């Protein structure tokens, strides 16, 4: 079958940084698992070419902000490899609606009509789910298959190789990754999750977007333009 790394299309800086990770047996097992699931007729999201979209869209040497999600969306046509983001033409999910509400409150940014966050990724916002695949209609179905180990390594690589990155950890799952981050050189921002179940327990009002830009500017870095284009 060949090595996993040889079969993965991945942006060059990440491929170099994660070379050793792709060589580990658990990544071969994960690859085999995904192939078996597809062979059994199961629908896996996002499509194969978009599994590593977060890394492809935001090269390692350009990472300024990391937002940590959990699972890809498990409905048809939603997931495209960026956490919280949906494909063009798909209704904006509730958690992302609350993210937009906080952006409006924090930076007076008009709430967009779509939920396609590619523009953020292209500016250096790594939109990283901790599991990179999911079975249709089955939330969390791939969480124990090795992805968390892989994405933990992604977080460690950013922490070790980059300077002055803002990590936004929303909810207990994301905050469990705090141990992977060197807070002496990075800014770690924690709050409740933007889900409708918890957004009003500390997500709305957290000011994370303005605080991120202040931190970037303090270190001579261009802030993120959180506006999204009218048309994705």
From Swiss-Prot:
Annotated active site residues, numbered on this chain, are 71
Query: Has keyword Translocase?
Result: no
Q: Does the keyword DNA damage apply?
A: yes
Major subcellular site: cytoplasm
Q: Which Pfam families match?
A: UDG
**Role of this protein:** Excises uracil residues from the DNA which can arise as a result of misincorporation of dUMP residues by DNA polymerase or due to deamination of cytosine.
Q: What is this protein called?
A: Uracil-DNA glycosylase
Species source reads Azotobacter vinelandii (strain DJ / ATCC BAA-1303)
